[in-house]
């Protein structure tokens, strides 16, 4: 699908992030080491599943501070934070304090990408 539509974006929302590193590792392993599972299908572009992830997919999360810690494995450009407002489990009205806690020690550029710039790029608007 991503070979045919390289600009297509697919996301996983409200699923947090910690499952992604294992999933990417297993997808790449299966693609390389278990050809019986990929018989008849190979990437036209020679890309691994994890490379398609980096180019075409994203994850939105709310409370996954461990995911923030391993953001380089998941991909800083593939992560979007959301407060889940107005639902009752939302971080609002303490969203700023919550973000300050889970992004403590994270470079400002990474924090900005995850909390604003990545969503702006995905949906085609300019962040504040």
What are these regions (language model features)?
Residues 8, 18-19, 42-43, 55-58, ...:
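Mid-to-C-terminal alpha-helical segments outside catalytic/metal-binding sites
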Residues 1, 84:
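Iron-sulfur cluster-binding electron-transfer modules in prokaryotic oxidoreductases
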Residues 2-51, 65-77:
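Histidine/acidic residue-rich metal-binding segments in metalloenzymes
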